């Protein structure tokens, strides 16, 4: 197993074809690659008690959630996980929430989605390649702001 510091945590909720991102302020957190046969990860987030009801609902309903996590340094690209809440524990004025799930190959999905959209817009051949490069550069510029 490998353990990393959790720097930032966002909940991603589907909104049409995209995701809405909501930041959850961390007090502290860890992320563990279990390196098991199912490639599962455990995420532990230590949070202010104002968020406890939401995570208790997720646990009770056994809902899958999509989380975006920055690991080790805030300058790292975020990793996307499909998880379920394992447990929620009150700790004084705070609580911890334990998630278990798998990392999602988000970049591959984004590339496929962008290519599909370009083809639907009528691009093909060399024009498709050029427009794809332009949009990738544009997306990277928007994400670096």
Regions found by a protein language model. Name each.
Residues 52-54, 76, 92, 106-110:
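Intrinsically disordered, low-complexity acidic/polar segments
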Residues 6, 10-17, 45, 112-125:
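Short secondary-structure transition/capping segments
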Residues 1-8, 24-27, 54-58, 62, ...:
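Charged, low-complexity, helix/coiled-coil-prone segments
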Residues 32-83:
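Compact, well-ordered interaction domains used in eukaryotic information-processing assemblies
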């Amino acid at each position: 197993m490998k353990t990393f510091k959790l720097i930032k945590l966002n909940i991603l909720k589907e909104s049409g074809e995209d995701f809405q991102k909501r930041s959850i302020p961390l007090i502290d957190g860890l992320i563990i690659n279990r390196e098991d046969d199912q490639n599962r990860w455990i995420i532990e987030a230590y949070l202010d008690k104002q968020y406890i009801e939401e995570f208790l609902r997720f646990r009770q309903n056994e809902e899958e959630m999509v989380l975006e996590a920055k690991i080790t340094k805030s300058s790292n690209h975020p990793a996307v996980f499909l998880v379920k809440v394992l447990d929620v524990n009150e700790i004084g004025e705070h609580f911890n929430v334990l998630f278990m799930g798998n990392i999602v190959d988000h970049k591959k999905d984004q590339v496929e989605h962008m290519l599909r959209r370009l083809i639907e817009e009528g691009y093909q051949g060399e024009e498709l390649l050029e427009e794809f490069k332009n949009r990738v550069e544009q997306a990277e510029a928007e994400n670096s702001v």
